[in-house]
Structure formats: C-alpha cells, structure tokens
C-alpha cells in the first residue's frame, strides 16, 4: 500500500496535470489545479475532503515545477502498465472498490494513458501492445469521445467534433488521427455501443444539510471527465451553470415539502429539470494549456428524488452522517442534439414538443423535449418573446397564422395545423417547424389567454450541435425591413389582445343548450326537494314560554319536556293564551256590559267635600294624570265631588245611619289597604275613596265591627258583602255602608285577598287589604274581601252589570278555578251566594261592585260614606274590543316570556316549599295577625293551591288587626283627605322580579268626568283614621288622620299578597287589577311588583287626590321581607286620555306624601316561612320603626324611578304589553313561594314569626277563610 502510494505520487508529479492524488484514507486530495482556480473554488489540498488535512501539500508545489521533458519520459516508461490498467478500469469500474490504493493508481494511470493517447503517435502503442489492442483501445476512446461531440458547447476544441458537421477543422492534434479514430469506432460500434450505454449517465448523493456531495457513481468520469473522487466533499451547486442555479434551487425548495412526507411519496417519484453541468478540464479535453481556457458546460436532464439517510455508516466513500438526515439523489443524463446531419428532413413520426405563450407573445411554458431540438433549456426561453424567434421573412405568414388562431378561438377546443415556418434555435441556425395551434379564450372576458403550439421539426439546422455557442455576428437587415417586421410584430400582439367575437348562431345554440340544461337541472332539483322539507316547524304553543336554552339558570338544569306535568306546571308558567281568562273575557263581551257611563248630572251629595265643581272633577279625572304619580291634583273634596258627579248612589255621611248607596251597574268595590275605599264606579271611585277614607275613620269605629266583620260577616259570602258590614261590621254602624262599602269592599276585597292567597295576591287587596286598615278589623272581612271583592257580586253577572262585567271583577274572580262559578269568579264572588245581584249590591256596597244597593252604614268620620256607583245604563258600550284583546294577548305572551326567564331562578324553591304548604299558609295567617310593632295587620287572601289542589282556595284567617300601623305618626292626614292607596300586587310566588310584571297598563275610565284616577302604582294603603282601623288587639298607636300606609304597619311582616276578584290559579298571579278598573269595569292595568331580588323595589305611591276620586281603597300588600317601599302619594292633576298607559315611573310617589314605609326582612312583623326565604339583604333594609315623615319628605318628588328587574332592565315598556286587566284570569301557583334566601336569614325570620304567633290575636279565623273555598 505504501509503495503504491508512492508510485501514485510520482505519477502525479510526472503528469503535471496539476492534480495530486493520494490513496491514503481513501480520499482524493486535490492541490491547486488550473481547474480549481478557474472554477473559482480555489480549494487547495489543505482543505481536504471530509475535513482531513492533505499530506501532499509540499509535494504539490514541487510537482508544478517539474519540467515537461522529464514527465514525458516517465509517462512513456509507464505506458504499457497504464494501458493495461485502463482496459481493466473501463470494463469493471462499477465493480471495483475505490478504497484500495491500487484503484487510485489505476485511475491515475487511466488519465495518464488517455492523455498520452491524445498527445503521442499511435506507433508507440502499436509497438507495445499490437494492432489488435490498439484498434480495441482506439475504439473505446473514440466511443468515449463520440457522445461528447454532440453535447459539448461550441467552445470545445474542434477536434472533439465529428467531421463533416460543417465547421472548420483545426486544433492541436492532427486531423488524420481523429479521422482514423472515428472510422475505427464506426467499424466496431455494435458491441462498444452496448457497453457505453451503461456509462451514459451518473448518479450522486447530496446531503440536504449542507449541499455536499456524499457519493458519486464511477460513470461520472465517463460522462463529465471528473475523477470519481473529485466531487466528494464538494458542493454540488458549484458544478451547475450560474444561470441554472436559480432553477436548481427552486426545484429543491419545491421538492423538500413533498419529500418530507417521506412514506407518502412513491419511491420512483421524481422531479425532472434541465441544467448545464461543468465539464472536467483535464488534459484529455483541454490539452496542456492551463491559463486562459474557458469552462465548458454540457446540458443534463436531472432526475431528483429525496431519500432518508441510513443510520449506519457504510464504506468510507459513502460518507453518511451518523444522524438521520434527508438526502438528495440526483441522476444526471446528458442531453444530446437530436440532429445527426445538417438540414436533415424528419419524418412525420418525429416527436413533438409544446411551447405556450401568452397573448402578449411572452413564452410561459416549454417542454423539456424541446431542449434537444432547439438547444434552449426551458428556463432560457421562459419570459422571452416568441416573436423574436420567428424568422423575419416569415412574419407575414405568422400574422396569418395568428389571425386563424383568433378565428378558431371562437370555438372552444378548436385547433388547426399551419404551414411550416422558420424558428430560431440556440446555435443561431433556423429549423423548419410544423405546428398545430390551439388557444384558450377566457369565457367571461372573451379575451385570448394563451396560445399553445405543438411543434414538430420538419427540417433540421445546418449545424447539428444545437448546443453550440451562436456566432456573435447577427445578420444585417435593412432598416426598412426591420421597421416592417417591428410593425408586423406589433400588429400580431394587438390582434391577440382583441376580444374574440362569437358568431350569433353559435351564441344562440349555446344559450339554448344551456337553458335546456338548466331546465333539466331544476326539474331534478325540484324532484329531490319535497314540500315536506320546506315546512317550517314551529314549537308547540306551550313551548313558547319554555325555551330549552333558558332552562339552565342559576346552575339549575330543568328542561321542561312534559309541560303538562304537575312539577313543570309549578316551575313553568302556562302560556298566556293557555290561561282561561279568554273564556271569561268572551263571557264578559257576550254579556254586553255598559261600562262607559254617560255624563250625567252629579247627584246631590251631603258632604261639604262634594261642593267642588264638575270642571274641577273633570280636570282631575284624567286617567293619565291619575295613574301617573302626577295626575290627581286637587283636594279630597275635588276627588269626592268628582266621584260623586257620576255616582248614582247617595253618599252616607251619617256615622250611625246606614246610608244605602244604590249601585247602578256593577260598582266593583275593591277595598285596598284597608282604607275601606269603595271604588264603586270608575272615576267615582275617588269620591268613594274619600268616602273610604271616611270609612277609615268609620273603620276605627268599625274597629268594633272589625272583629265582627272579619268574623262571620266576612265569612258569610253574602254577609261579607254589605251584609257583614251592614250588620256585623257596621254593627257599630261606624262603618255603616261605608264599611260595607269601603270596608266590605275593603274587607271583602281584602277578604278575597286575605282569604284567597291568590286573591290577596292578585292583589286587589293583596296583603294590603289584609294589611290594610280595612282589613285591620275591617279586613276582617276576609269575607268581605272574600266574598265581595271577588264577590260574585262584583263579578256576578249582575254585578257585571257594568262593573261586574268588568273583565276584571268577574274575570279575576271567575277565572279563578277556585270559583267555579263564572260569576263568582270574583275571589269573593266565588261564594255562590254573592252571585246574587242584590247581594252583589250589598256587597257592592261592601265590595263596591254590587249592583244592588249597599247599605252605607257607619259613621263616615270626616267624610261621606259615599257609596257611589257608576256605570249607569246610559253609558255607551265598552270600548274594549276583541281585536284589542287579541293584540293584548300577543303582547302579553312576549312579555310573560321575558319575565318568566327573569323569575325562573326563584322556582327552585317550589319543591322544598311544596312540602311546607300547610306551614306556609299558617305562617301567612300568623303574619296577618302580627300584633307587635307598627307593622301588623297584613292580610293574605287568595287561592293557595298546589298541583293536586290547584283550584282549591286555601282558607286563611283574616287579619282583624288593622295593618296600618302608624310607622310615622308625625305625618297626619286631614280626616277628610281620603288617601287612595293602591293595592300592591306583590306576587308570593317564586317570581324573583321585584318590579311589576306589567308595569304599564291601560285605563279606560268609565266616567270621563271623574275628578282624578288613582295612581294604581301607589303601594301604601292609606289607613282610615287609626281609631277605625285599630282593633282592640292591635297595638299600633292610634294617630287620627295618620297617613301611614298599610305597609308601614305590615311592612316587615307583610307578605305581599295580591287580591283580585277572580278565580284562584295554581301559580302566582301575574297581573294586578286596579280598583278603579274593578269599580267602573274600565280597563285598568296595574303593575304588580314581585319581590325576591335584592334590588329595592320602588313602589309607586297613590296620589291622595286620586284616592278621593275613587271611594275605594286598594290594599297595599308586601309579600315578604323583600325590600319594598310603599307610600301614599299625592300628585297634581293632569288631563288624561281615554286610554292611559301607566308606567311604574308615573307611579313613583311624590314626596308630598309622607307615608312611605320601608320593609325590612328582619323587621318586627314576622313573615311566613316562604317569606322568610326572601332575600334578606334587601336594598331597603331600614326598620319600620326607623321611618319618619322626614324620610318620606326627604325624597325628591321629581325623582321618578322606573321599575327595573333584577338585571336593571326597565319595565317601562309599551303600555299595551303590561295590561293587568286580565290579572285575575291568570293561574297562579302557590303564592307563598319565594326564592330561597340564605339559611341564616330564614332562621332569623322564623324566630320573628314565632314571636308574631305569640302576639297575634285571631278573632274569627274560621270565618276569615276565603269564601272561594266555600264556594
């Protein structure tokens, strides 16, 4: 090995080929050679391949200094050995391992022998080997050079070209030598050619990490002339022509992403492209000249594929990295000219190649098959104008061809063949082409996009080697001809830029064909799409209120799949249209009631307060003003007179006498907040109210009757009517008619309320009633309220007289399932007896809705016990129409959905409370009788039902104590100033919304001349004079003319009860019927606030003036500790229209009324168990005892607040959406249910409840039961 290495070194020095080869480490070390210097690589032997230092650096320098003579002698001496080595190397180059020193020597000898053959005479070879070896050797060398003659560029020496190509011969070697070599090769082409096919291409492996060549096949020496080891460790791109490096790089970047999928790409998948590779500039090709020689490039077609490098190391030559890496495998095949002889004629079977250019003539695509025919690589032609490649003499023909192209372009896919024309190739010659032309026209713009020519060579060039460098000189063309050619080229380009016209017949055919296709498609489409698929599926009607996405609230998942299930009926209120109030409304319309009384001369009233003029009454009557907080202006006298103007009943001012007010029509008396205000007539109510007020005073007289009333009277369906009052209640006669009027109606109302949990809820009298003074003792008329209010009377068909018919009265009660009787539908009405028209009358007096005469008994202290009845037969028919009702239904449906979502969070307590139904009812009763503190006298009425007993009203004892505790004794009220307090309809259900569900409502005044309408939003019932409301067992201080509200008395303990004369439903009442509406059968909608959320609920106050207009008190009831401020408000008169939309903002209490009470969860009055569950942290958390008139007065009377729900959304919406006129027809679930509160607060409230129990005095609890239950 060492000897061979030394010999190799010597050969290298002698050859003076500027190459030093060493076999040590199987690496070819390269010294500074002329090739290296010219190629720009400048890599010396010190660089070494594979990072190994060269051991031949010093000898390399010496080798350059060797003289040529000595080297020639050495070569001659070694000629025989070299020749033998060459033959063996040529035959078995692929098989021999290149790691041995012998192989290196053989390669070196091969180079030397080739050089000697090229430079010396053939006689030297003949002398050593013989003619046969020489012929064989010459043949091999000739075949090795022959393929290069067609592929080498023009700069190659002429000696490498075939003779007869048409180029001059010359060069360093004698021509005879080459001719002989060529001829000898031709004689032996058969076997030699087969052998050379294997050597026609080479492969190399390149690392994608750094682009270094890791492996090459031995055939690279035959193809490019490089020794095999020359490329190892070199960058492949160094051997690529500069102009082709961008193409090579682009192919690499596009191929890498594909290769990274690795297994997904087939093994044989390749990308092919053409580049020029540098040839070896050894002595074999370039002779001995080193300086001044050009670098020659040869075209190759490269097939590129990616592989994953193997993990293990192979032979030293493999040079594979230890770590896994991507490898690029390139197989290079030389591209040779397709022409053998000059100007040869090709047959029709010659291959075609395609060139595509745009309308501007710019070439956009060239087939790789065109390289051998044109000599251009695809990247050489891309971006050039094809017009430059046409022969200038053929441009007119080319123009005709393109005109034909434009014509054929009218038909998609049309093609044609043109006459032959000349085309310029790379070596500067022209070839004759036959082309099949086609084009593509944009169907939208109708412009030519590109032209494709499929070319076939008809005649070859004069110079067969198409890769030869073209001559520098260009043919000279006359300037005139050049201008002409330029003009023709421009015309061609302009022609291609024009729009392609289409024949009209073609257009028509295409349109017809497309129309037919469209019609066929539509028929198929219609067959596929059936009508059933187009059906719009709407949810079931009762699903409208139960949205699945709304079922998840407050962490509770309660999808209501069975909406008729008993449980879901508790948690999910029925659809608005499912409520049975529609039936009652229809019955109301069928009864053809007269609810809008005609203006009549006011009856003479015996009260000084009635002295006000009719004009004053009219001015104060405006329903808008009355219902807004600002409406009712004027004194109580105005109210009284205004109400009396249209009252057909006499006002009984006698304290003892029983003034019988004849109730013409149905004067529904809804006693509110125990003021005993009898709203017999719409609008007259105020007068009644004032009467009621008087009653208040009377009530105190009635105190006596208080117990009685609540006792039997109330219980007695009829009794509770006027009877009770007349007899028991008014036994004392204090209340006389009034009591019966106001009280009764009050009591009654409250009765209904009180007795009917629901009733009370619907809240005519609501808790109020019960709380109300009326209910104080008067309330005792649960009966009263019971029977009367809801009294069939009120509702009673008779009552329905005008007022009875009132949807409200009759409806409210009637609708209540409890009161099976339609007439009785009134909560109190539910009592069959009440249905009697007369009773109704009596009750009307009592309940204010009776059409009969009401015995106005009782001293009306300070006022007229005015028993005013409105609704004379002269009045025009009601303006409520079914169309209006339908519209209302739709709006109510939407609003109920909204409120239902807001209140759903409170329904979770239903199940818990269900088990506590009895206890809850008892606790409610206890609350009604709370005797300590100012807050007592809360009366709860209304039907209290569960799934099983949804239509059965629960019986409840009436509060005999007047709930009008004087929380603020400092604020006295003039005795004759009856303050009309609206019943606060606080839902006892689990509804959490603290504002009225329907904040706005319409009021159709029955008597347009009524002085003023009460602001139904006012929650604080005005007590009658304390002496009247105070029972013996009530401990509230008796302050005459005290303007304390019933909520003052019952504030903390009051459970918001809503009283509406109507049927009880198993879910909380959603609507509140205003007393005025009940009295005059006018449509009035009162917002009903629902407690249960910490937000303070600003309850509107009722102007005192409006109270005097209606001799009916609405009992303000508070459902629980939820924070509710109830006040009695006085407002200025404001003219109102027939339809008046009242919003909670309008009901805001002005500061003029000092009787505002704040309820606190922990107040003295103990709420029921359900009420204990109310939010303890109410925004208004001040005790009733802390209240004083200054607090009430401190409020800015202009500070009008709208009801807002728990989310702060205002309920001040369209008035039509909030009609509570139908509140009495809404089913209600158990009224005592309220959202659960923290256990701590609940326990605290229970303690208070127990305290209330001990102090409560129930006089006739059995008589206080809801009369609906009896009926």
From Swiss-Prot:
Residues 15-46, 1014-1023 have a biased composition (Low complexity). A motif (Nuclear localization signal) lies at residues 65-78. InterPro entries: PAS, PAS-like_dom_sf, PAS_fold, Period_circadian_regulator. GO terms for cellular component: nucleus; perinuclear region of cytoplasm. Phosphorylated with a circadian rhythmicity, probably by the double-time protein (dbt). Phosphorylation could be implicated in the stability of per monomer and in the formation of heterodimer per-tim. Residues 1-102, 596-660, 746-913, 928-956, 1014-1050, 1143-1191, 1227-1271 are annotated as: Disordered. Sequence repeats lie at residues 657-658, 659-660, 661-662, 663-664, 665-666, 667-668, 674-675, 676-677. Residues 189-259, 339-409 form the PAS domain. The keyword Repeat applies. Residues 1-14, 80-90, 746-772, 781-803, 864-884, 1143-1167 have a biased composition (Polar residues). Pfam families: PAS, PAS_11. CDD domains: PAS. It comes from the Eukaryota. It is found in: Nucleus; Cytoplasm, Perinuclear region. Forms a heterodimer with timeless (TIM); the complex then translocates into the nucleus. Essential for biological clock functions. Determines the period length of circadian and ultradian rhythms; an increase in PER dosage leads to shortened circadian rhythms and a decrease leads to lengthened circadian rhythms. Essential for the circadian rhythmicity of locomotor activity, eclosion behavior, and for the rhythmic component of the male courtship song that originates in the thoracic nervous system. The biological cycle depends on the rhythmic formation and nuclear localization of the TIM-PER complex. Light induces the degradation of TIM, which promotes elimination of PER. This is Period circadian protein. It comes from Drosophila pseudoobscura pseudoobscura. The gene is per.
């Amino acid at each position: 090995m060492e000897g061979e290495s030394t010999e190799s070194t010597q050969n290298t020095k002698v050859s003076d080929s500027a190459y030093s080869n060493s076999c040590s480490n199987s690496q070819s070390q390269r010294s500074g050679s002329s090739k290296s210097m010219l190629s720009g690589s400048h890599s010396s032997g010190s660089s070494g391949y594979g990072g190994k230092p060269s051991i031949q650096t010093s000898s390399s320098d010496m080798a350059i200094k060797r003289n040529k003579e000595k080297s020639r002698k050495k070569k001659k001496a070694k000629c025989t050995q070299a020749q033998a080595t060459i033959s063996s190397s040529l035959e078995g180059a692929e098989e021999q391992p290149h790691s041995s020193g012998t192989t290196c020597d053989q390669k070196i000898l091969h180079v030397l022998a080739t050089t000697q053959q090229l430079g010396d005479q053939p006689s030297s070879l003949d002398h050593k080997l013989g003619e046969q070896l020489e012929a064989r050797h010459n043949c091999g060398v000739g075949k090795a050079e022959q393929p290069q003659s067609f592929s080498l560029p023009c700069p190659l020496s002429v000696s490498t070209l075939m003779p007869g190509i048409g180029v001059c011969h010359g060069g360093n070697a004698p021509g005879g030598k080459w001719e002989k070599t060529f001829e000898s090769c031709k004689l032996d082409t058969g076997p030699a050619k087969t052998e050379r096919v294997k050597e026609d291409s080479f492969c190399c492996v390149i690392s994608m990490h750094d682009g270094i060549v890791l492996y090459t096949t031995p055939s690279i020496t035959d193809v490019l002339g490089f020794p095999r080891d020359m490329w190892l460790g070199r960058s492949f791109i160094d051997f690529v022509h500069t102009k082709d490096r961008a193409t090579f790089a682009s192919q690499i970047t596009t191929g890498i992403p594909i290769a990274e999928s690795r297994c997904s790409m087939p093994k044989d998948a390749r990308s092919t492209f053409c580049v020029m590779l540098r040839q070896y500039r050894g002595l074999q090709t370039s002779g001995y000249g080193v300086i001044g020689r050009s670098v020659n490039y040869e075209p190759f077609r490269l097939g590129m594929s990616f592989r994953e490098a193997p993990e293990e190391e192979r032979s030293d030559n493999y040079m594979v990295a230890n770590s896994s890496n991507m490898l690029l495998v390139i197989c290079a095949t030389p591209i040779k000219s397709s022409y053998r002889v000059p100007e040869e004629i090709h047959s029709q079977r010659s291959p075609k190649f395609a060139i595509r250019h745009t309308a501007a003539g710019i070439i956009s695509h060239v087939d790789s098959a065109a390289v051998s025919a044109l000599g251009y690589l695809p990247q050489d032609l891309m971006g050039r104008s094809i017009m430059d490649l046409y022969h200038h003499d053929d441009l007119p023909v080319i123009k005709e061809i393109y005109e034909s192209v434009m014509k054929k372009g009218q038909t998609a896919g049309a093609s044609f063949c043109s006459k032959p024309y000349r085309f310029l190739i790379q070596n500067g010659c022209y070839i004759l082409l036959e082309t099949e032309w086609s084009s593509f026209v944009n169907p939208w713009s109708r412009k030519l996009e590109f032209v494709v020519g499929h070319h076939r060579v008809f005649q070859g060039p004069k110079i067969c080697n198409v890769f030869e460098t073209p001559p520098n000189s260009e043919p000279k063309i006359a300037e005139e001809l050049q201008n002409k050619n330029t003009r023709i080229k421009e015309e061609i380009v302009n022609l291609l830029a024009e729009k392609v016209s289409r024949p009209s017949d073609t257009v028509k055919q295409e349109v017809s064909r497309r129309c037919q296709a469209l019609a066929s498609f539509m028929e198929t489409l219609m067959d596929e799409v059936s009508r059933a698929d187009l059906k719009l599926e709407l949810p079931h009607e009762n699903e409208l209120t139960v949205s699945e996405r709304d079922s998840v609230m407050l962490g509770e998942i309660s999808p209501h799949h069975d909406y008729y299930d008993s449980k879901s009926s508790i948690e999910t209120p029925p659809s608005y249209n499912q409520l049975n109030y529609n039936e009652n409304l229809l019955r109301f319309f069928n009864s053809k009631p007269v609810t809008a009384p005609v203006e009549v001369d006011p009856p003479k009233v015996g009260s000084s307060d009635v002295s006000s003029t009719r004009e004053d009454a009219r001015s104060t009557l405006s329903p808008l003003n009355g219902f807004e907080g600002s409406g009712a202006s004027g004194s109580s006298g105005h109210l009284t007179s205004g109400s009396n103007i249209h009252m057909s009943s006499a006002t009984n001012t006698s304290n003892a006498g029983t003034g019988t007010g004849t109730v013409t029509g149905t004067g529904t008396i809804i006693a509110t907040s125990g003021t005993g205000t009898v709203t017999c007539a719409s609008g007259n109510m105020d007068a009644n109210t004032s009467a009621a007020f008087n009653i208040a005073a009377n009530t105190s007289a009635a105190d006596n009757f208080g117990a009685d009333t609540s006792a039997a009277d109330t219980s007695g369906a009829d009794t509770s009517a006027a009877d009770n009052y007349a007899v028991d209640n008014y036994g004392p006669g204090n209340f006389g008619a009034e009591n019966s009027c106001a009280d009764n109606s009050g009591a009654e109302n409250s009765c209904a309320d009180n007795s009917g949990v629901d009733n009370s809820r619907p809240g005519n009298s609501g808790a109020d009633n019960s709380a109300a003074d009326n209910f104080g003792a008067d309330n005792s008329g649960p009966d009263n309220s019971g029977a009367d209010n809801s009294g069939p009377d009120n509702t009673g068909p008779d009552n329905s007289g005008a007022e009875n018919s009132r949807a409200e009265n009759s409806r409210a009660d009637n609708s209540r399932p409890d009161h099976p009787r339609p007439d009785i539908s009134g909560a109190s009405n539910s009592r069959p007896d009440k249905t009697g028209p007369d009773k109704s009358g009596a009750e009307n007096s009592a309940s204010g809705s009776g059409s009969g005469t009401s015995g106005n008994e009782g001293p009306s202290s300070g006022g007229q016990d005015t028993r005013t009845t409105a609704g004379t037969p002269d009045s025009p028919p009601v303006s409520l129409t079914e169309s209006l009702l339908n519209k209302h239904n739709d709006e109510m449906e939407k609003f109920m959905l909204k409120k239902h979502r807001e209140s759903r969070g409170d329904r979770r307590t239903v199940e818990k409370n269900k088990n506590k139904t009895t206890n809850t009812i008892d606790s409610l009763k206890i609350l009604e009788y709370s005797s300590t503190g100012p807050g007592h006298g809360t009366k709860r009425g209304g039907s209290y039902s569960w799934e099983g007993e949804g239509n059965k009203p629960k019986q409840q004892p009436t509060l005999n104590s007047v709930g009008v505790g004087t929380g603020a004794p400092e604020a006295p009220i003039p005795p004759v100033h009856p303050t009309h307090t609206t019943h606060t309809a606080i839902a006892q259900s689990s509804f959490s919304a603290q504002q009225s569900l329907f904040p706005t409502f319409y009021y159709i005044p029955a008597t347009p001349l009524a002085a003023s309408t009460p602001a139904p939003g006012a929650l604080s019932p005005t007590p009658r004079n304390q002496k009247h409301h105070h029972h013996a067992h009530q401990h509230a201080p008796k302050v005459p003319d005290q303007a304390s509200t019933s909520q003052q008395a019952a504030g903390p303990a009051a459970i918001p009860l809503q009283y509406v004369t109507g049927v009880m439903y198993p879910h909380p009442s959603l609507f509140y019927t205003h007393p005025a509406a009940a009295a005059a059968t006018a449509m009035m909608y009162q917002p009903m606030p629902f407690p249960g959320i910490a937000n303070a609920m600003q309850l509107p106050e009722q102007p005192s003036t409006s109270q005097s207009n209606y001799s009916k008190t609405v009992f303000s009831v508070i459902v629980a500790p939820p924070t509710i401020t109830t006040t009695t408000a006085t407002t200025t008169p404001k003219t109102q229209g027939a339809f008046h939309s009242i919003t909670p903002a309008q009901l805001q209490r002005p500061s003029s009324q000092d009787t505002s009470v704040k309820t606190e969860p922990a107040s003295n009055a103990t709420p029921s168990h359900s009420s204990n569950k109310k939010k303890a942290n109410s925004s208004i958390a001040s005790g009733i005892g802390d209240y004083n008139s200054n607090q009430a007065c401190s409020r800015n009377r202009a500070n009008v607040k709208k009801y807002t729900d728990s989310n702060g959304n205002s309920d001040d919406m369209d008035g039509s959406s909030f009609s509570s006129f139908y509140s009495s027809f809404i089913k209600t679930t158990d009224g005592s249910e309220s959202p659960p509160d923290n256990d701590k607060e609940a326990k605290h409230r229970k303690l208070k409840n127990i305290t209330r129990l001990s102090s409560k005095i129930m006089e006739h609890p059995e008589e206080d039961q809801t009369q609906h239950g009896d009926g």
